[in-house]
């Protein structure tokens, strides 16, 4: 990765990026995380000499993009309105190149149910699941999937609205809570075993990271607030299993159409089998975030990572 980046860096002219809008903040439930990610990206690009315009996305976005004469956009919005294909569609209508995945891949990845359906159709392992829309759905899922289970809003990130449950009563309560965030709620089989997260950058898979947390799972607090989460790089897998994980990640990304950069979450069960959970097309870039951590393990500092993501928008969208 370092040699590939060195080749990129040797030919990189930051002036070629033009006037770059960093789109961050927004109105989703992940706004606070996006504000932190955006601030870090803005600082890195500014320090590198890029002409940056910071735009906290609101109702005046279209006017700002036009009045600021934006040439390119770095999307660091998390969640709905920025990571679900809608922002990508707006930018394409305006003819503004942008970072990350396109409209379809962004929309697919934001929809946990559709992502799982694509993976299942291609034989890519993902935990069994059910859609919850009523108490009777909860009862049926309890019977068909057993316990423990994990409940998820279908279109939220950062583990917002998620809960592990061990009984039908807990499942009903968790469904009702998740439904406050999303009209569509999923429940999945709980996979017992270690969790891994794998970042991808410019078509390459970065070193996998093993996660350890004293929390029930890698939730919002573990991701962004507390400092008791353990990260292991190298991830502790033997070379054969690590390569299997890398190959599975690449296959899963290709299935969704991930471009530029992203991050996948994977569980390994007690039999050593891997299970894909979900994919993130605009991962966090805070001081707790995993993509910068994986990039460091591959030899890239934060500024190099940000420039590599931005440079990919030139390669793919001009």
Curated annotation (Swiss-Prot):
Question: What InterPro entries does the annotation carry?
Answer: ATP-grasp (IPR011761), ATP_grasp_subdomain_1 (IPR013815), D-Ala_lig_Van_CS (IPR000291), D_ala_D_ala (IPR005905), Dala_Dala_lig_C (IPR011095), Dala_Dala_lig_N (IPR011127), PreATP-grasp_dom_sf (IPR016185)
Q: Which cofactor does it need?
A: Mg(2+); Mn(2+)
* GO terms of biological process kind: cell wall organization; peptidoglycan biosynthetic process; regulation of cell shape
Judging by the UniProt lineage, the source's domain of life is Bacteria
According to its UniProt record, where is this protein located?
Cytoplasm
Q: Where does Mg(2+) 1 bind?
A: 265, 278
- NCBIfam families assigned: D_ala_D_alaTIGR, PRK01372.1
- Matching PANTHER family, A to Z? D-ALANINE--D-ALANINE LIGASE, D-ALANINE--D-ALANINE LIGASE B
Q: What is this protein called?
A: D-alanine--D-alanine ligase B
Q: What is the lineage of its organism?
A: Bacteria, Pseudomonadati, Pseudomonadota, Gammaproteobacteria, Pseudomonadales
Q: Which gene encodes it?
A: ddlB
